[in-house]
Structures are given as C-alpha cells and as structure tokens.
UniProtKB/Swiss-Prot annotation:
The keyword NADP does not apply. One of its GO terms (cellular component) is growth cone. Disulfide bonds join 41-96, 139-189, 235-288, 330-386, 427-480. Residues 20-111, 116-205, 212-302, 309-402, 407-492 form the Ig-like C2-type domain. Residues 20-711 are extracellular. This is Neural cell adhesion molecule 1. The modification Phosphoserine is found at residues 770, 774, 887, 890, 926, 946, 958, 1005. The chain crosses the membrane at residues 712-729. Pfam families: fn3 (PF00041), I-set (PF07679), Ig_3 (PF13927).
Amino acid sequence: MLRTKDLIWTLFFLGTAVSLQVDIVPSQGEISVGESKFFLCQVAGDAKDKDISWFSPNGEKLSPNQQRISVVWNDDDSSTLTIYNANIDDAGIYKCVVTAEDGTQSEATVNVKIFQKLMFKNAPTPQEFKEGEDAVIVCDVVSSLPPTIIWKHKGRDVILKKDVRFIVLSNNYLQIRGIKKTDEGTYRCEGRILARGEINFKDIQVIVNVPPTVQARQSIVNATANLGQSVTLVCDADGFPEPTMSWTKDGEPIENEEEDDEKHIFSDDSSELTIRNVDKNDEAEYVCIAENKAGEQDASIHLKVFAKPKITYVENQTAMELEEQVTLTCEASGDPIPSITWRTSTRNISSEEKTLDGHMVVRSHARVSSLTLKSIQYTDAGEYICTASNTIGQDSQSMYLEFQYAPKLQGPVAVYTWEGNQVNITCEVFAYPSATISWFRDGQLLPSSNYSNIKIYNTPSASYLEVTPDSENDFGNYNCTAVNRIGQESLEFILVQADTPSSPSIDRVEPYSSTAQVQFDEPEATGGVPILKYKAEWKSLGEESWHFKWYDAKEANMEGIVTIMGLKPETRYSVRLAALNGKGLGEISAATEFKTQPVREPSAPKLEGQMGEDGNSIKVNLIKQDDGGSPIRHYLVKYRALASEWKPEIRLPSGSDHVMLKSLDWNAEYEVYVVAENQQGKSKAAHFVFRTSAQPTAIPANGSPTAGLSTGAIVGILIVIFVLLLVVMDITCYFLNKCGLLMCIAVNLCGKAGPGAKGKDMEEGKAAFSKDESKEPIVEVRTEEERTPNHDGGKHTEPNETTPLTEPELPADTTATVEDMLPSVTTVTTNSDTITETFATAQNSPTSETTTLTSSIAPPATTVPDSNSVPAGQATPSKGVTASSSSPASAPKVAPLVDLSDTPTSAPSASNLSSTVLANQGAVLSPSTPASAGETSKAPPASKASPAPTPTPAGAASPLAAVAAPATDAPQAKQEAPSTKGPDPEPTQPGTVKNPPEAATAPASPKSKAATTNPSQGEDLKMDEGNFKTPDIDLAKDVFAALGSPRPATGASGQASELAPSPADSAVPPAPAKTEKGPVETKSEPPESEAKPAPTEVKTVPNDATQTKENESKA
C-alpha cells in the first residue's frame, strides 16, 4: 500500500519534469469593434530554449512587430498578443504554441470574440424639412446583434401618441407625413440590445422650414408725375427662416447696394421701396420677391403714374373774308388721356357741337382736337381757348383767329331829343384792320363851321356824334362811314324831334281805408325818350286843389301799380295819372273815382326775408301796408319749425320795420306769421316760409370767437374774469375805503397805517393828508351844532324840502368855494378873486363825501369900519333861519378832521386872491399860495378863551355837516391876499362876539407872528404815501401857514371863540365887511393870549346828512 503511493508521486514528478504547461491570460476575450486588447501566454516548466509562437484563427503564424495585430516575446516564459482596433474579421481562436528544445510542443488557446457595439452611423442633426412634405428622419444604427429602435419626442414615444402621421419605417427611420411647424423640435433615436442590456441614443434636431408668403399692401398704386411726389411700395412677407426681399422693375432687378441712387430707397428689411420724384418713366410693374430655404414667392405692384394735361401744340390762324373755312388745332398730353374742349371769351363750344348750317365742327381723336369754322364771319375773330382736362387737372392755352374784313356798322338808327338837349348818336364799328370813321351831313364832312353845335368823339370800337339841336334844322339824317383796306361801310342815322309821352291808362283802383292802389298801363307813346316818373294826382270830392306825388318809373313799371297814401276813410276821391320824360310832362289821364273803405282792421304787412350769415338766423322785413284808417298799435309775430309747437308770440312796436329770429334749428323749414293790430282789430296774418342752412362742419371765419371753445376753456375764462373783478374791487376798496387785501398788504408789509389809526385821529378832531410824500396842510373843521337860547331867543329853523341846499351866491368877487366831488380832483378856478378847490374827504368820515371850503381873506384895514360895509340892521335873515346874536358863552363845536390824504392839491394862482363870506355860512376857509406859508403876519391880541364846546351827541348828524349860523349884527371884514408876499398885517376882532356897534368901534390889537410852513411838533409817520402828524401838532397853525392865511387869535385855554356869522340874504348885495375872529383850538399854544390872523372855518356840505335834531340842517 505504501509502495503504490510512493510510485504515483514519483511518476508525477517525472512527468512534470519532462512536459511544459502553457496558459493564456485571459482565457476568454470579448472585444467590441474598434477597441484594442492584449493576451499573455505564460509557460511553466524547466525546459530551456523554448519557442513561443502565436497562430491566428486561420492557422497562420503571427509575425511579431505588426501594426494592428502585434506579437511581442516578453521573456523565455511569456509572450503577448495585442489586437489593435479590432474588427469583425479578427474574431476566432488564437493559439499559443510552446516548442521545447527536444521538439515537444505544448499549446493553449483563447477564443477571441469581437462584437459590434451600438453605434449611430447615419443620424445627422439638425435635419431640415419643408412644411407640408413627408419628412423622413434618418437614424442608422450599427450593432452586432439587431437592435431595437425607439423614437421619442418631448420625452414620449412617438408611436404612443397614436398620431397616424408618425410611422417607423422598416429601416427604423421615422416618417412624419405632412410635417407641420408645430412638429418642430428634438427627436431622440434610441437603440437597445436586449442580450447585452446595451442602450444608446442620439438626439436629432428637426427644423421645419416654412416657405415664404408675400403680399403687396396695394396691388395698384397711383401717383402724379412732375409734382415732386414720392411713392412707397410695400410688401409684407412671412416665412421661416425670415425671407430676404428683392425687387424688380419690369423684370429688371433693382439693386439695393447703389449708394448714389437717389431715385430708389429701401427700408432696412427691403420690404419697402420708396420712389422719389415720381415721373412718367417710373410707371411700371414692380415685383417684390421673398426667398428663404423653403422656397420663394413674389407679388406684383402696378405703379400707375398719372400726369396733368399739358397743351403741347396750338397755332394762331388768319382768315380773310369770304374764305370757305379755317381749322384750329390743339394737341395735349397727359394720363389719363385728357379730353379737349373749346370756348371763346363769350361762349363754350361743345365737343359734339355742329350748327345747322355746319358753321362750327369739333373733331377729337386721342390727344388731338380740331375746331373747323366754315363760312367765316367777322364775328368769328378773336380768342379761342383750348382746355385739356383729366382727373388730375387741366391746362389751357389760347390761340387767336385773326379775321380781316370790311367794316361793319351798328347802332340805333333813330335817336330822339329836343331843342337844347344834348344827345349822342352812336356808330359802332367792327373792322379788321381798324377802320377810319367819318361823319357827314347832307354830304358835308363833320364837324364844320356850319355846324358848330356838333362834336365828334372816337374810341377804338365806336364813334360818337354829339349834337345839341338849336332849331328844327338840326334834326334829320346823319351819315357814318367807316373805311379800311378791305372795304368800306356806311350807315344812316336819323335825329328825331322828341315829344312828351301820352297819358297812361288807369285800369282799376283798389281802395283801402287810408290808401289806394292804382293799377295802370304804360303810355302807348313815350315820345321817343324813356319815361322818368309818373305823377299821381288825387282829391276828394268837393276839394278844389289836387294832391300829387311823383313815383319813379322803374319801380312803378315793375308791377304797374302806384300806391296813394294818407287818405281819409270812407271818402270819395278822384285820381288821375300823367307820365314825365325828358321832354316834359305828358298828357294827364281821365280821372277815375273811388271811395275809400271805412275804418277797419289794417292790411297784413308784406314780408321779405333775408338769411343771416351764420345760416340759422333770419331778418324778416315788415313792409307796412294799409293801416285801416287807424294807426297801427303793434305787430304780433309768431313762428315755428314745421311740425313743432309755436314759439312765444313777439310783440313789436308799430314803428318796427323788421324782426330778427336767431338761434334757429339747422336745416329746418320755418313758417312765420305776422299780424298788424290797430284799434279796430287785427289784420289777416302775413305768412312767410323759409328754410335754414345745413349745419356747417367748420367754424365760419366771421363766427363768434367762443363758438369753438371747449367747456373747460369757457370755465377758465369765467374764472379769470371773476378773479379780475375781485382784484378791481379790492383796488377800489383800497383807494375808497382803505380796506381789502391790498390794504392789508400795505399795512403789514409796507408799514402803512391802517384805517383804524385814521379813525382814531378822526375822533380826536385831527386829520392828515399828503400827496406824493410831500407835507400838506392839515385841515381842522369846525361846526356849530347848537344855538344858545340868548340869540334873540330864537331857535335854528329846521330846513324842509323847500329849503334850498345851497344859498344864492353873493355877487362879491372875493368868494371862493371848495367842494369835494368824487373822484378826488383838485380844481382851482380863478375868476377875479374866486378860488375853488376840491378835496377828497376822509374815508372813515361818517358824513357825505362833499366838503365846501369857503375862505375870506381881509386886506389890511384900520379899526374904522369899511365904508362899503352894510350895517347889521340892513341884513335880512335867510329863509328858514332865525336871526340871532352870538353869545360869548357859546363855543363852536370841533368836528372830526376831514381826510384829504387821497386828494392832490393844486396851487392857487399867484395873483391877488380875495373872497367874501357866503350868506348864511357859519365859517370860511381861506386858501392861499404856498409861497406865503413862510411869511409872518401880525394880528391884535385876542380876548379870553370862550368856554369849551359841548360834545356832539351820538345821535346827532355827522359832525362834518356845517350848521348854518347867519347873524344880522356882525359885519363882514374884507381881506386881501398879497400876490407875492406873505399876509400883510390886518386888524382882528376880540375873541368874544360883539354886537355891531362894538364891532365897528373895536380898537386894533398888537400884531403877532404868523405860523410857518413847517408847523410839525411831533414825529412824522408814513401813512398813505404822506406824512402823518402826531396829535400834538398845531393843526390850525399848519393849515393857515400852508394856505398862506393869517391865523386867528386863541384864548388862554387854547380854544377859539365863536366866529361872527355872515350877513343874511338882503335885497342889496352886501359889501365886504370886517370879519370877527374867534379862537382856534390848539394843543400846543401857551396859555397867554396871542394875536392871530383872521380865522378860517370849513363848511362841509354833505350829500346825504342824517337829520337828528331840530337845530341841525340838511346839506
């Protein structure tokens, strides 16, 4: 058992040592076509000098170092077989043979399998197709085993779409029948080999090209030549890819690359072709061609170029008398072919015209027309106009037919006139060449010495023989003879003695109440000269004289009626007619009797309409007819559009001659009825029908400027007008009442004083006024409101409605009246010594706005009364006023100041000015020249101050209203103003009022210093463009200094005494007397008494004062 085992191992080792073992790694080989792979042949054994060889499947030994199938001997025990880029033919069993040194061989084999991997041999992308064709998408798949092909689109199997248009062909191509643009996209060709689980795919982009479509916007385009026009031809093309455009003209390409081609201009995409300066040569058929990959298409546009007609040929012609015919020719060009017409200066000749005798024949063919005149007459000569017309326009040319003929004479053969009446015998001459004209009488050439009353006037077309018959011998035959080189012609004229016309015949008379219409026939014989007028005579039965009236013959002959007016109703009349010509009044007709109708209703007026220029208004004229013997009271007019309601009736005065109907409906028919009415009743209605114009589409040139404004524009205009009215009102309030927005701005921004400040000054009895920022006088107004009971125990009489507002002016030359009449104006009137100034009163004054300032300036005088003064006892009190004596206890009432700030002050005259106190005026103010303001004046010292005045009650009349205070015992003082110097010294009366004897014997007082022109004692404040003085200013001093008047004396208390009233109205005009002075209230005067100039008081005459007390008068 043991020996057997050992024997086996011994045999094994012996066998191994003798034979070699060959192995190939890898033992199996699969290669895809195109891939490379190597195999290693290894030998195991101790044999030396072995030979390793490789054999191909066909048994051929593979030589080493080949390029595609390479064999490399690595060492004694191994060798490598490498197959590069294997193909199907390389498949098979490869054998590795090892040969030992003793010749024994050992081998090993490897089965090399080569398979075709899934490959897309023919599957291009993109693949393009034409829309509508059957598209086949190519996809060739190469594989060792037959693959399964699946087509997908948008991730889905196209077969599963159940679209019969999609078919997979036997060669695995995909067919799409009638491919659409919507089928465009990416298609996936996917191949699968189930045995190997191999899969591969290829995405193919499918593009569907759409053949171009092109359409001309206009197949026919019209243009007009030679007008500098441009025309654009447009083609709209569509397709995919976007087609390119090209153009041809009558088959010839129009190049788009010529930069210097100013005739043709292309758009960026060449879809538009613009032809500039179109002329006739541009007329052609233009083709636009659209082309892309899918094909091409074209469209045609026919450019039709029209041309205005143009006359290309005309020729003047000359013809002789007795020639048979002449032809005028006219040629014209144009497109469309123009039609040619003929006309002369007086008539149109139709293209088909042919007179009965064949005198004119018109023939036309294409562009040529001819006018043939047969049996030519001299009247055929002249201008012939050839006109060529088509739808584009027209052209005309003139040609002239010159006809040479003997003279032809025309004119009225019988000419009527009378002795002493100048008349012209007219001999009209038609001749070519021009003829020489001569006049003969009884074979004698005119003019001649035997016929001094004959004159001849020649014109190119006629000769006039002016004859003024002196006797019967001048009447008879006159011969006119014309001669030219063709021949001559003569014509006899007869100058006939004219006669008066025969009588017209009255057919019938149509009487009415106050008129009658006489219908007549014209005279049978006019006497050879025209009838100028008709004379109608009529009278009532029993009257001896005839009434008559002349009627123009032209108007009367139109209707054969004359109307007699102004007749009496129900009265019998006789009427007769006569005609008047240049010779004289003709026979009068037989009288015809008629009787007027009784008083009745009037006849309907005659209506005539005249449409307005706007088209929807009418002026209906009313022509008065018979009034029925009673004056017409009025006319009643009513109108309406047909089938509409009547408009409200219109009543017109009897004197109306028309009625205007406006704002009528457009294009509507209206009817108008007019009835005349007198005391007897209404007439029949006169009826008038008219139609308005159609509403215009455009605004007429003479239409209303706002007719075409929109609602917004009208509202805007109204707003602007409203704002302007507010501005005007504000400015008015500023200047009149010192209020409003403008005043607020002036107060807050410009520092002006407001109306409240001015009112405060008014309450204090002060006022300031200024103009152009200059200092002006401040006027203090004094009024006397109450009369003291000791003035003769009388009371002031209340004026009634019969009391005059102003007293009669005294005839003295020294009266100056100043009245304020709005608007603010300063008027200085110098009449002898009279000065009148007008100021604007304060806006806040409760009185009216009229102030009368009367000043009296007394000349230097002694204490002796003026010899011309009238004693107080002679003065007669004015009506309604009780004379009373002044009392020292009574004091004038200080009224609020008059604001004259808005009134420009004009300087009075430099001449001597003097004034006297008006009758029944309590005080006077004496204005003077500004130059005298700086002068000083002296006056006697004043007496003691009077008691303080009593304040005015709230319910009293306006404090500016002057109270008439006449006095019968106070003489007036006369005062004279110097011309160039300041006021001279003058006498003054004591402060207390004295009776007339005392006033006459009062001694003169020492003189005092007058006020200067700058009396301001306080700070100047700007107000209303002037200087406002502080309340501590001596107002009276300022006023009199500015006016150049002496200042009145004041008492110790600074209050002026009462002034002596002026004399009342008297039968004898009073002479100027000395004026008694009263103290003037001031705040800055010292207590001691000073001599002051004569006082001046202001009388305000209000326009409308409120009467509250018995002692207050109406202004």
